Design a protein with these regions (language model features):
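Surface-exposed, glycine-biased beta-strand/turn segments
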Residues: 32-105, 135, 144, 148, ...
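Short peripheral tails and domain-boundary helices/loops at the edges of structured domains
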Residues: 116, 120, 158-178
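Single conserved hydrophobic/aromatic residue that forms the stacking wall/gate
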Residues: 1-7, 11-14
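Extracytoplasmic and endomembrane cell-envelope/extracellular-matrix remodeling and assembly machinery
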Residues: 13-42
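Sec-exported extracytoplasmic/periplasmic mature domains
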Residues: 23-31, 138, 144, 171-175
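Zn2+-dependent peptidoglycan hydrolase active-site motif and core
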Residues: 84-126, 151-159
Length: 183
């Protein structure tokens, strides 16, 4: 918890518009016409409601069972809604294999060319393969399926099929800047 609080303080200092950026991501609702091929101007938003930062239990890159952790774990009660971080198309909606490559029940969404997010250890999945979702749509619910030691959301961000730390991209325009530079 102390490391999480310190990381949050550093993030806030590096992003003077933190509150504005954070709050705009919680204006949920339908965002028109941004998929396929682009993210809307709000960028990547948190997959959980406000307060999630205090519940980070494992950061990206930390050691877990002898290897680097490839996502961010956020401890939340079972059944907490999980939201799409951006508009996109569901490319995986695993609701039948509770082991699911150790992710348990999970959802993967393609948001733009080369940008994907993954939401794992869900208690249930609320979307289907091929479905288009909008930022803020409920896609599943926090659980503890797969290789999990308790209820939490395992959240991953992929850029060009490489897992990267999602934390700096949440509520900022970093992803838009990355896409401008890359494409």
């Amino acid at each position: 918890l102390l490391a999480s609080s310190a990381a949050s303080d550093v993030y806030k200092r590096q992003n003077p518009n933190y509150i504005e950026q954070f709050l705009r991501c919680y204006t949920f609702g339908t965002i028109s016409g941004t998929y396929p091929g682009s993210l809307n101007s709000r960028g990547l938003c948190a997959p959980l409601e406000p307060g999630w930062e205090q519940n980070i239990t494992q950061h990206f890159g930390g050691m877990y069972s002898g290897s680097p952790h490839k996502g961010m774990d956020i401890g939340m009660p079972e059944g907490t809604p999980v939201y799409a971080a951006a508009d996109g198309k569901v490319t995986v909606a695993n609701a039948s294999d509770s082991w699911g490559y150790s992710w348990g029940y999970y959802v993967k969404i393609n948001h733009a060319e080369g940008v994907d997010t993954l939401y794992a250890h869900l208690s249930s999945v609320a979307v289907s393969y091929g479905q288009y979702v909008h930022q803020g749509d409920v896609i599943g619910y926090v659980g503890s399926t797969g290789n999990s030691s308790g209820n939490h959301l395992h959240f991953e961000l992929y850029l060009e099929n490489n897992r990267v730390d999602p934390y700096p991209y949440i509520g900022t325009d970093l992803l838009s800047k990355y896409l401008e530079r890359t494409f």
